[in-house]
A protein has these predicted regions:
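A short, well-ordered alpha-helix in the C-terminal region of glycosyltransferases
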Residues: 288-302
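Structural loop-to-beta junction motif characteristic of Rossmann-like glycosyltransferase folds
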Residues: 10, 72-73, 216-217, 234-242, ...
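Conserved nucleotide-sugar phosphate-binding/catalytic loop shared by glycosyltransferases and other
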Residues: 1-32, 39, 121-124, 267-269
């Protein structure tokens, strides 16, 4: 986030908000949460916002709660197919809920918790610059000819070690299917693995749009933001959600699209065995691959950011 915001006219403020987890943080929560609320109060008094936009997460709770006490309207945004704990708590204090995935479970929970809340299916905002890439740019970055299918494994800036290990363990089989682009995550490259048709990089920012445009099949985690961007791209996609014990919402995000036959979903515990066969099936024909991408594209909401911005502006003017 820090790298993404660098150079943009957005003021970033840190707040020491506690997480409601186990261990020492749970013991200290009764002490730390009031301090976080006091910190939030000072920030809100200084900035005097007309409206507060909360995306969920532990940082949003003290700010939104104090904002409600100060009679500032709270607008929530829920990215995922199931509502997070912070947003569930903040519903009763909020005026408007924007939902990224139009799931009945999210809507019903909002209605049951707060009968006065207004609900709008806005979609999830995307980085529109990701849609500006080209095949020529991808060829330039990777050195690939583009004559073979392009397989992209994209674990995000933090990387996904399970994805990395599966790629390294089945690289020979993947290279039988096409050229492989592997974004490992910061500091997770294996520099001793080299091949003319294997492009390995930890993180790409400026050139990421070209890599995405160049890819025929993309393998990714199932975070809501990634899914929104992949839907906008309309690429054939394989999702590998985090296990339920880590993040249940990724499983739900992926399941929602799997039911619609818009993505292929693989379990990370058996990824080494299933990754290559899944990609082989997608690449079985151009029609098969394109239809999968087209079905995912039907879930794209390219103007999600504008929809949310309009709600914020309308609320602020009231």
């Amino acid at each position: 986030d820090r790298a993404f915001l660098r150079g943009k006219k957005i003021e970033k403020i840190s707040i020491l908000a506690p997480k409601l987890t186990g261990g020492i943080e749970l013991i200290l929560f009764p002490l730390l949460f009031p301090l976080a609320c006091l910190h939030a109060l000072l920030i809100l008094i200084w900035f005097r916002p007309h409206v507060i936009f909360a995306k969920g997460g532990y940082v949003s709770v003290p700010v939104a709660l104090v904002g409600w006490i100060l009679r500032r309207p709270i607008i929530l945004h829920e990215s995922d197919s199931i509502m997070g704990r912070a947003n569930r708590f903040l519903l009763r204090f909020s005026r408007h809920l924007c939902i990224g995935a139009p799931q009945k479970e999210v809507t019903n929970e909002a209605i049951m918790t707060s009968t006065k809340i207004e609900i709008t299916a806005t979609g999830n905002p995307i980085r529109k610059e990701l849609l500006t890439g080209s095949d020529d740019g991808g060829r330039r970055v990777t050195g690939f000819s583009g004559k073979k299918p392009i397989i992209l494994i994209w674990g995000g800036s933090q990387g996904a070690q399970t994805l990395n290990e599966a790629v390294w363990g089945s690289l020979e089989q993947l290279l039988d299917l096409g050229d492989v682009i592997h974004l490992t995550g910061r500091g997770k490259q294996k520099k001793n693995i080299t091949h003319a048709r294997y492009f390995q990089q930890d993180v790409l920012y400026k050139e990421l749009p070209n890599i995405l445009a160049f890819a025929d099949v993309i393998v990714s985690r199932a975070g809501a933001g990634s899914i929104a961007e992949l839907a906008a791209l309309g690429k054939a996609t394989v999702l590998v959600p985090l296990p339920v014990k880590v993040q249940k919402h990724q499983q739900e995000n992926a399941h929602f699209l799997e039911i619609a036959n818009a993505v292929v979903v693989l379990d990370q515990d058996s990824l080494q065995e299933t990754l290559t066969p899944a990609i082989r099936e997608i690449l079985r024909s151009d029609t098969n691959r394109q239809e999968l991408g087209s079905r995912l594209h039907t879930f794209a909401v390219p103007d999600a950011a504008e929809r949310i911005a309009n709600i914020l502006l309308e609320t602020a003017r009231r």
